[in-house]
Swiss-Prot record:
Residues 27-45, 92-101 are periplasmic. It comes from Escherichia coli (strain K12). This is Inner membrane protein YqjF. The chain crosses the membrane at residues 6-26, 46-66, 71-91, 102-122. It is found in: Cell inner membrane. Pfam families: DoxX. The keyword Hydrolase does not apply. GO terms for cellular component: plasma membrane. Keywords: Cell inner membrane, Cell membrane, Membrane, Transmembrane, Transmembrane helix. InterPro entries: DoxX (IPR032808), DoxX-like_oxidoreductase (IPR051907).
Amino acid sequence: MKKLEDVGVLVARILMPILFITAGWGKITGYAGTQQYMEAMGVPGFMLPLVILLEFGGGLAILFGFLTRTTALFTAGFTLLTAFLFHSNFAEGVNSLMFMKNLTISGGFLLLAITGPGAYSIDRLLNKKW
């Protein structure tokens, strides 16, 4: 059963960061527009490199199982924060769905922070007791 669990965690680690890696890449390639949008929403533009680091870098870290527990905690917190900053105006149609999506994603990352990266991960290779 342990092997099935490890494969399941690996599949989750592959699926969960897809949104973050693609969103981070979009922010890299559309830096100026993203910075303007953030500032229009009241978030200082100087925060964008940190957002990119968390989305793109954190997404890759989760994908490969590197610093998984810590990255998953930061990503869960970031996702909750973005839910409240960018999706809490439920009068705008899709925001309630986006808000709930972010809550769900945060739950997945919290679960990953608790369970760890599984056997098929860089963390496992670096430290046998993940």
